[in-house]
Amino acid sequence: DLLAKELIKVMDGQIENVYYKSETTLPYKSETDKEDGYLIGSANEADFIAIENGLKFKADWIKGQKTGFFVDQRDNRALLEHYAKDKDVLNMFCYTGGFSFYAMRGGAKSVTSVDSSAKAIELTKENVELNFPGDTRHKAEATDAFKFLDDMKDGEYDLIILDPPAFAKHRDVLKRALNGYKKLNAKAFEKIRKGGILFTFSCSQA
């Protein structure tokens, strides 16, 4: 509560709401035992929209994954934009589609967004219309990532993004997680177009 009040003071009126969230984001129980909720302000019926480098993203900080929008990937998204021109881009585990929109703005020939969550895919489609209304370069598919990689043709994409959810939140599943990452990346290397670029990330905490 004290930190929230200081944020309001330092930002001089630029912050209207502060939401505390840890129960559904941490792999362990917070020592404070504080329930998720608003520290300052309250829920607004209007959609929350994050603006990053001129692009807009609908997000759900209450029910969405972690904080609803992964700002830690901001620099990587901006980097990808510079490699996307005239590329066929595949964004795996796309969630709200962040990497996809940077690729589109960077001049990608085509962009495919894949996520196992139908809700995430719907949000991605909404964000496409928010930033690039009527743009036919983008398509989205709700399906398992490993199945999609297995089924796709070799050399179909020359830029692939792998940003999966945590495979290991605890050390007791670390070995299985490492095998999962190896399998995922090996399959991407196998399928990517010759001379292509792979952006790969891991958020596992083990």
Predicted regions and their residues:
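Non-catalytic substrate-recognition/targeting regions of SAM-dependent transferases
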Residues: 2-69
